[in-house]
């Protein structure tokens, strides 16, 4: 309720929180209210896939930030005087991109930023969402209670615990299984697990050397007589 009220009463506001905390549900409610008040909704995301997911979640037309910037600036008119811009996954937006966005808008356009400041930072310079939140100059409501649903993997709860600096009560939880393995056995363990479902497995390593060794061992396991491609 606080997040909905904040988004409706402030010209610029943020709705933040980790996965599974209900950002999409809150945003859907806010946008329905704005639409009922006569606002034209402009919803954008950084990538095409993210824009598609946003459309599926909120039911309003969405586009990429790049496409929005190629179109005419968003400004009031006699036909449509009220506009709202929603920027999803805004933790991924760097400073130059945000500058281009705000200069593409009339000052009367309302803005809602959504995202998780604890996710990966932007590739370019500037951590816009984190800086906005830390400044306290823009209204922000953080959703910090994971709404676990039936069939949940448990990953949001697990990551939220780690984000708080706490050790999860159980290292294996939900769909997460922790294999206690000595360093010299990590590659063998990964190879064994990979063999169980090679086409549905992604292995992530901490170093390039480890990734190289894992790739080599998995290739030997799945395609022992294969030839390396030369470029």
Predicted regions and their residues:
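Helix N-cap/beta->alpha junction signal
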Residues: 47, 94, 205-208
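Short hydrophobic/aromatic beta-strand immediately N-terminal to the Walker A/P-loop
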Residues: 13-16, 112, 202
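ASCE P-loop NTPase motor cores of helicases and related translocases
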Residues: 1-85, 92, 133-148, 155-178
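Conserved helicase motor core of P-loop NTPases
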Residues: 2, 6, 117-231
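Residue-level marker for buried hydrophobic side chains located in beta-strands
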Residues: 85, 111-113
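Short, conserved "post-DEAD/DEAH" coupling segment immediately C-terminal to helicase motif II
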Residues: 95-109, 127-132
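A short acidic, amphipathic alpha-helical/loop segment
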Residues: 30, 97-101, 217
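Walker B catalytic acidic pair
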Residues: 88-89, 115
